[in-house]
């Protein structure tokens, strides 16, 4: 329908009429308006009722939560108070009154913090750090029932802490009158509290095959790699593969490796050694040789001894630490005797020294290597004063270069050794180490 402006204006004016006009124009308007207002009031009442119910429910929920929190907090407070009371009671029962003496048992129950405050030295731990420790001689020692067990000792060193042998502690005991196996434990500690241990198993047996007349102490000098021979190659050198062959033969044939205290007791007729006993020694402590000794002795688990020249005491001590091995024991080859100046034998300086000078040398060189069980005379030269000094120094054995076995009844201050040359065949080696 086309737009009629007059009609539109009339409708607008009708909407703006006062209430009386609307009532006149529409007699039912009032009742309709009242119904709308009543309905609106009813809706508002219903809405208020609903809101009131929701508010009440929310209030109840909040009150319940507050009660729960209060209850939980109360429990925490009660538990804390109980724990505090329990701790106080424990302290009161642990720490004695100052008027009462503290028993040994109570002292051991003191909290660790007190022990740390009183501690003056590092506590040992199970971490060995860089300590290397090994048993002197065979780790399986044999004793005939009724004979005395001879303690062979152990050796230890650390690249960072040097020689540790003098501080080794020995524990365990052997009843040599009762057959069985016994364990001796050696413990070395450094200044940082690191602890390393080695064990010896002592077998007390009713009987065994023994050495009858003597024992071979082998004398080697230097070891070299076949691909890099020394320029001054001579009989004092042995190629590493041949030394490896020697060690393999000894192990394959069940040889036993006695300690120097055992050798001394055997030579003096006080102790039996198992059949096929042998001692391996290497003179001078040359760097390359020490590297081979560490590798080969560890490979075959054969103990060997390096007689170290200690003229440069710092360098010698550093070698002991650098080449520390469970299977390499370091002993003295003197500080000032490995040089010419004497008038006997090979012209070694020992014959120009007094007994006291020799004794001082022995003690100082033993301190460098950390052990005083054995000594090798430089150039094999010895004198009566030298032998007296060895005895006064308390060494178990001292060795010359006289080419022979050590026999029962020999003088332990001047024992023989069997020279091993790199030029010898394996058959010659076998002949030299076996008792005929």
Language-model features: where?
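C-terminal domain-boundary segment and adjacent tail
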Residues: 238-272, 313, 391-436
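Serine/threonine-rich, repeat-prone extracellular segments and beta-strand-based repeat modules
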Residues: 161-200
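Hydrophobic single-pass membrane-insertion segments
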Residues: 85-101
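Short beta-strand edge segments in extracellular beta-sheet folds
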Residues: 201-209
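Solvent-exposed, low-complexity, repeat-rich "mucin-like" stalks and linkers
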Residues: 111-161
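Metal-dependent polysaccharide deacetylase catalytic core of the NodB/CE4 family, i.e.
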Residues: 213-237, 274-278, 286-385, 411-415, ...
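N-terminal Sec-pathway targeting helices
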Residues: 60-78
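N-terminal targeting leaders characterized by basic, low-complexity, disordered sequences
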Residues: 1-63
